[in-house]
């Protein structure tokens, strides 16, 4: 039972089977927020981390890999406290990656942008572990998302992680068919590995037309 509101949908097995038939990669999303201190408590408990890593590894065998979306780390932290938050999360990611690689499963991280209010993510260290990183360059406050801040986030990420490992996260509810083309243009300008869209079900036909005209789907 999900505590964050995102449930595994009915018929998910059929979706996975169809993805396999079309030679499409699939990822299991593991999503937790730290609003109530859940993540902080987890990262302070080595036994709990090991149990979670093992559970994720077992479940992930049905997928091509895992998309780890641990949100909210580092808010109001600074100095040594912030550094400890970053180290603990990096340690967890390293443990998870080791477990996943025993079954040749991939690891994607969905991270708050480097210029967000949540600095608890060491992009350089995480970029050396994960296969891909999604820069969640949204929730800056205004809509469409401000181009200057999105581009700044990409520049900051590229200074620490090879561009081909980075995907620009785009929140469809924050964009229009016109503005989403601008965001895709930023990803292209910096030679990123691609874009990641949040989420299916809220991307309108105008956006799809823009995406089809500007992107090549990779399986």
What is the predicted role of each segment?
Residues 1-219:
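Secreted glycan hydrolases and related glycan-binding modules that recognize and/or cleave
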């Amino acid at each position: 039972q999900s505590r964050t509101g995102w449930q595994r949908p009915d018929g998910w097995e059929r979706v996975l089977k169809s993805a396999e038939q079309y030679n499409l990669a699939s990822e299991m999303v593991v999503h937790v927020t730290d609003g109530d201190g859940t993540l902080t408590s987890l990262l302070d408990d080595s036994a709990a981390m090991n149990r979670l890593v093992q559970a994720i590894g077992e479940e992930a065998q049905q997928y091509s890999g895992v998309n780890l979306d641990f949100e909210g780390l580092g808010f109001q932290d600074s100095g040594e406290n912030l550094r400890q938050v970053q180290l603990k999360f990096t340690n967890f990611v390293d443990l998870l990656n080791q477990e996943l690689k025993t079954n040749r499963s991939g690891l994607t991280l969905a991270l708050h942008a480097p210029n967000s209010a949540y600095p608890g993510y060491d992009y350089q260290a995480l970029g050396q572990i994960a296969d891909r990183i999604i820069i969640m360059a949204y929730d800056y406050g205004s809509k469409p998302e401000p181009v200057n801040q999105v581009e700044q986030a990409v520049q900051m990420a590229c200074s620490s992680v090879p561009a081909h490992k980075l995907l620009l996260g785009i929140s469809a509810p924050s964009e229009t068919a016109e503005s989403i083309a601008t965001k895709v243009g930023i990803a292209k300008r910096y030679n990123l590995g691609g874009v990641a869209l949040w989420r299916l079900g809220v991307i309108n036909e105008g956006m799809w037309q823009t995406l089809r005209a500007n992107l090549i789907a990779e399986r």
